[in-house]
C-alpha cells in the first residue's frame, strides 16, 4: 500500500498511525522510545481518535475489560461506529462478539481446533512446505541464481492452503485469499466507501462458496457452520459468512507473518540459525521466542463507556489499539525483553492475545510455524538477506506485522 493518506506521522506519542509504513518496520524501537520517554499510552486524532497502550499491564487491562471496551470492531479504519454491526454479535463472530454472546459463538468453533483435530494435519502441512520449497528452488535454478523470496514464494502459501482445505475452499484460490487479507487488514486508511466495496467482494465470493456447500455438503468447516445450531436454531447467514471470513483472514495473515518474521530473524542472526540446524529439537522452544519477539497481531477495541484510563480521557467510540507485540517486549514482564533468546524457557507471551478473545487457532498456528521452520532449515540450512542492509525487505502495514517481501540468498 502506498504511504497513508493522512500524511506522515509528526510525533509517535501524539500522532501515532499504524498505517504509516515506518511503523511496522521500526515498531520495536518506536515502542521502546515512547515508554522510556514517559509515554505508556500513545494517542492520535486519526481515525476519529485512537489510543495505544504500550505496556504489558495496560494492554492486559484493556484486553480483560469487556465492560468498558467492546470488540464489535477489531480493525481500526476510517469507518465510524455506525458502520459496524452492533454488539454483542458483530460482523465476524466470535472475534467481534461481546459477552455473553461471545462465549456461545466461540464454543461452536473450539472443537474444530482442538489438538486431536489439528495434529493429524502435520503430514499434509509438511508436504505442502516441501512442495513450495521445490517450486521456489526450481524457479531460482531456472533464473541461474541463488535467491528466493521466503515470504511470497513460501510463507504466504502455507496457511492460505491449509485453512482453505479446512474450510472447504478451493486451495487454488490462494491468490484471491491474499487479496482479501490485504483489503481487510492493510487497506485501512482508504475511504469508507472503497473499504466497503472490498468487503462486498469478499462477501460475494463467500456467498458462492456457501451456496455450493448447501448444494453439495461435505466434511469441512463450512458445512459444519451450516449445520450447527445455536440456541436451538441454525446460525444466521451473516453469522456463517462472518465466521468463515474470520477463519480465512485470521488464519492466513497472522501465521504467514509469523513464519516470515521467524525466517527474517534467522537470516539476520546466523548463530541462531546454525544452532537450530545443529539442534533441531530446539525449534519448538525457539518458535515460542519468535512468537514473543515478533508477535504479529495487534487487535483493537472500541471504547464502550466514557472513562479516564490512567490519565487518558477516553470517549465512547474512540479506538484502542492493543499491540500484543509491544506487551511482549515490556521489560517489566520479560527478562531481557528486547533480546531474542531462542532457548528462553519461561515464556508466557501474549502473541495469541489476552482475555476472552485469545486466538482459538493457536494449536494450528504453532504447528504450521514449527513445520515451516523445520522444513526450511532442513532444505536451506544456510541463508542470509539478499541485500545485507535489508533495503529490499518490505514490511506490512496495519495491525498485522510481518515481512511481505523477504528476498534471501542461499549460501
Residue ranges and their predicted role:
Residues 1-411:
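Cytochrome P450
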